[in-house]
Amino acid sequence: MHPTFSRILLAAALASAGSPAVATEIQLEQGWNAEQRASWYDASLGSRLLPLAWAQALERPDSEEHLFSEDNARRLGFPLRNWQGGELRLPRGFALDQQDDSQFSDTRLRWKARQSSSEPWVGLNCAGCHSTDISYRGSELTVDAGATLANVQAIFDEVLAALRRTSDDGDKFARFAGNVLGSEDSPANRDLLKAALAKRAALIDTLLSMSATDLQPGPGRLDATGQSLNRAAINSGARHLQANPTDAPTSFPALWHTLQMDKLQSSGFVPNVKVLDLNGQVFDLGYLAGDIGVVQGDYGDVVSHPLSGLEGYISSIRVDNLTRVEGLIHKLKAPAWPSQLFGAPDSARLAQGKRLYEENCAACHASIGRDDLQTPIKVRQVRLKAHGDDAPIGTDPWMACNTFTFSSPSGNYFGLFRPSLGTPSGVGIVGRTSKIADMQVPEVFQIMLGKKGQLADGIAEIIHAIVTGQQTLPGSDSLQALPTGQLLLAGGDPAGSQAPSLAAGEVPADKSARKDYCLNTEHPFLGYIARPLNGIWATAPYLHNG
């Protein structure tokens, strides 16, 4: 889990904010100390977008300005910061990833003779999409794990355009090669470098072409779910991929209280299942599964193979660091309104807002104290179709509809066991063509098995049982502690327990017909969840449908 700003200009500031030469930086209290904040911004999760040497040398497509210059990084919404407090400056939300790539696929690139198999790469981490800046009257506030207003899609598009232009423009390539190769610059190494450039551009182009749409998400929004699903389809190794336009951008959620919620993602399609490890500690299995999907969409390297057993898939995804980051989120608090800077809220307006909230919002959005980081939160989901006493939600259906219907040939995922957890079609076997969400879940479990050494004691055995169909997850909504190694929280109603099994071939290809299909189908994934609204003052834009 980036054109323009990562700055929220509060409405009150528009008339009065100046342009100070030096801004006063203010860090809000959110439950983290300095070391924990540094871990949030510096940890590699296994995303590998570009080799570091390339990122430092790559120019913007239409100029000689470096792609990650101070000005361009800030324009895109990723101000540069000193990674791990050292001299290396990376866009905020980018981290250095250095692993042995000998068994990787997409990122096992060689651009010079006798090159190391542990070249450093850069890629996104959680802070890339979940950190916020607020500018107000000469002060700069940082909101940790908030909702970015960076233009995430633009940075991917610019990277691809820069790779292509560098490969095609002789002068650009000469400058690039000189910077990347240094003392090892030679005709032979330039040939290797050009081939590596072409390979990297082709991989990024495959994902962006598969996801192509005329809709531009712009700052603060991204169809991250669609991108993650399409990346899972690419990682299947299937030869003939099906285009699935990522035309359902949503704003980025703030992450406080999310580990307490029973459903995750805008449509609630990821049940926040928790299990107990052999030491009796709660392990956030559902949250980890969702995060692995996000890192995969952000150019994590995954190597799938047919009919995988229990050895799992090799990948660059850092399950160990994901688990540590989730530990940080357990401690994260929503930012309190900074009265010392903005002034105390008007008491009359507070009373008016409280009344409006109780009349129009409280029925869906649960209330929880800012300091309450333990109480489980059962989120309210409102369906696209009328359901029981609920009227249809009446908002943009496409994030939920696309997640439910995106399909593709299954490639190496064919024959994997499909658990009820997080799959639209419930328990079964992945077929030759499948809904991507039906095959991404078993794929993510295979990624976990490939990192079993980074899992807590006993968790690999639970995943073994799930992927072989020996343990299925109940449909109960109850929150209860069960014996060690068993399910702790079902996280809502798994699709397989109550929903019809729907084959990919039943989904209409025509978009208008697909919309009608989603609006008239009863399914737990076809709706949106309403979460607690703590800290919402810091999470613009305020779109009710995300």
What are the roles of these predicted feature ranges?
Residues A11-A12, A21:
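Cleavable N-terminal signal peptides
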Residues S16-G18:
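N-terminal signal peptide c-region/cleavage motif recognized by signal peptidases
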